[in-house]
Amino acid sequence: EIAQCLVGSEMCIRDRPTDDRQTTGGRNNMKVVSATKVLLYSGLLAERDRETLFEVNALLPQFEYGREYDQESFLVAMQSCFQTTDDREAVTIMASNIVNTQQGTFSDDGVSQQAIIKTGVTTKDAAFVPNPVSLIPYRTFLEVPQPASDFVFRISEGRGGAPAFKLVAADGGLWKSQAVDNVKNYLVKALADVPDREKITIIA
């Protein structure tokens, strides 16, 4: 956990020689640098500088937005890189039932798409591709709520006429500030009962 790692660092700080603790004033700063990185800094040293005491980085599944995936890779990524939501299920069902473009057709007006999907053993129906879709990817520390974002879901013809799928972010990166706030709020609550809590300043 983020908090456990950083609290462990704080315990080490209190075990430092007295001269070191007097130099830093016994205070430390915890900074949420980004949605995936938290640093613990010392107080000001004699050189009016700060020492980086600890760094915690989120380990997350990787998904490349804007990249085209083949059908199998896309379906696996949807299951492993996104939380379960109605829109995720709609995208997954659509992607899993798309007919090879050599057998079916796509129509695209620049805003919405229509594709041929399988509805039975031999039956094929036209279905509109859901857009935009609200999805919740794993993009920040797993201990905190993951921000939802809108994405444009696109289907195109890939190698050999097989369908290809991609998701394009459509929120302008607003999720990043929300994720940083979520991490900060988590740390404030998780460290509330730490001894000398008043000597730790959490900033974002």
Residue ranges, per PLM feature:
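Generic N-terminal initiation segments characterized by hydrophobic and/or small/turn-forming residues
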Residues: 3, 36-37, 50-51, 56-57, ...
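Amphipathic, membrane-inserting segments
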Residues: 10, 15-47, 114-204
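An exposure/low-complexity boundary signal
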Residues: 30-33, 48, 53-54, 99-100, ...
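A glycine-rich, hydrophobic loop/mini-helix early in the fold
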Residues: 40-68
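Charged, low-complexity surface segments at secondary-structure and domain boundaries
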Residues: 58-63, 80, 168-173
